[in-house]
Curated annotation (Swiss-Prot):
Pathway: Carbohydrate degradation; glycolysis; pyruvate from D-glyceraldehyde 3-phosphate: step 2/5. The gene is pgk. GO terms for molecular function: ADP binding; ATP binding; phosphoglycerate kinase activity. The lineage of its organism: Bacteria, Bacillati, Bacillota, Bacilli, Lactobacillales. Monomer. This is Phosphoglycerate kinase. It is found in: Cytoplasm.
Length: 401
């Protein structure tokens, strides 16, 4: 079902409530990586260029007690946003009440206002009440009453049912739309999963099989090949009876891995060789081994033959979805597999290439190939939920066309 988009809404003179994802790192009152703020700019600019009054909502971090609040104020974000837009941004240091309502009433067409961190609502009078993250119906209704229309551009929180995304949207039937970022995520991830150009290859990495079981299960029916790297590969090794030494293995998931292997046939591509280390440390002694891994050694990256094998599988692909690193990416000596795969994806100019997850995204940025890829997903958990084939509450609540 097609969803309303920001371009379908009347904006001139309207109070446009917008859920954005400004959950960015802040240190000493200064925003570190502002990628998520930059990603929201096209939708914000569209709204204000068309005479709308942009009222922005975002969460930042987790708030479980009063003492968490001062360090998680969105004030530094308002300052960075103001610089990026090259215009004033009104910051309102509260999430409800007269101060907020007056500030909204005083807005003119084209103005931008940022409401305090929505998760301030999770703690009231010292009590952890989760009004925002528990989708308190009264809070969603109240926030919805502050505007005329609603735009959700926060794909990163679409898998969560919060008052600031689902709550507002359900109280504005027929007036809740997707922003450009949300629209892009729905298009690329949706097409990749439901209507991919083939061959469709998924690359799944990261430490734990348990995090990706749902994704593997869903994609086995849809992908032509699934490449497995990272720590999760060694639970599959164990399921095949290959010795894994001291490598990471989820013993309680070996049976699940066996079932996946039986179902997958030759669809699943595992590493042929691995870079093993004598301890979990960047300065460990290392060697490359094929097959069994001896006791006292642990696999921390895929080996050169695996890299070549994975490239071989990828070279003819027309759709590629990559989520998760091939090794311990944060240690430079075990980042090579991840970087090699990232570099190779940048050469697949005829394919739709979609990257999600923190380490995979960091790798393509470090390599400078981000602009050669079709789409970099802004939502870690949200993109995994989407790849599992599950409905995302934040998207479901957006009005249908």
């Amino acid at each position: 079902m097609a969803k309303l988009t920001v371009e379908d809404l009347p904006l001139e003179g309207k109070k446009v409530l917008m859920r954005v994802d400004f959950n960015v790192p802040i240190k000493d009152g200064v925003v570190g990586d502002d990628n998520r703020i930059v990603a929201a700019l096209p939708t914000i600019k569209y709204v204000i260029d068309h005479g709308g009054r942009a009222i922005l909502f975002s969460h930042l971090g987790r708030i479980k007690k009063e003492e968490d609040k001062p360090g998680l104020s969105l004030r530094p974000v308002a300052e960075r946003l103001s610089n990026l837009l090259n215009k004033p941004v009104t910051f309102v240091p509260v999430t409800e009440g007269k101060q907020l309502e007056d500030a909204i009433d005083n807005m003119k067409n084209g103005d931008v206002l940022l409401v305090q961190n929505t998760r301030y609502e999770d703690v009231k009078d010292g009590e952890y009440v989760k009004r925002e993250s528990g989708n308190d119906p009264e809070l969603g209704k109240y926030w919805a009453s502050l505007g005329d229309v609603f735009v959700n551009d926060a794909f990163g929180t679409a898998h969560r049912k919060h008052a600031s995304n689902v709550g507002i949207a359900t109280n504005m039937p027929g007036k809740a739309a997707a922003g450009y970022l949300m629209e892009k995520e729905i298009k690329f991830l949706g097409d990749a999963v439901d209507n991919p150009e083939r061959p469709f290859v998924a690359i799944l990495g990261g430490a734990k099989v348990s995090d990706k079981i749902g994704v593997i299960d869903n994609l086995l029916d849809k992908a032509d090949k699934i490449i497995i790297g990272g720590g999760m590969a060694y639970t599959f090794y164990a399921a095949k009876g290959i010795k894994v030494g001291n490598s990471l293995v989820e013993k309680d998931k070996i049976d699940v891995a066996k079932q996946i292997l039986d179902k997958a046939g030759d669809k699943l591509v595992l590493p042929i060789d691995n870079v093993v280390a004598d301890k979990f440390n960047n300065d460990a002694d290392t060697k490359v081994v094929e097959g069994d891994i001896d006791n006292g050694w642990m696999a921390l990256d895929i080996g050169p033959k695996s890299v070549e094998e994975f490239k071989n599988v990828l070279k003819d692909a027309k759709t590629v979805v990559w989520n998760g690193p091939m090794g311990v990416f944060e240690m430079p000596n075990f980042a090579k597999g991840t970087l090699e795969i990232g570099k190779f994806l940048g050469t697949l100019t005829d394919a739709t290439t979609i990257v999600g997850g923190g380490d995979s995204t960091a790798a393509v940025k470090e390599l400078g190939v981000a602009d050669k890829l079709t789409h970099i997903s802004t939502g870690g958990g949200a993109s995994l939920t989407y790849l599992e084939g599950n409905e995302l509450p934040g998207i479901a609540a957006i009005s249908d066309k």
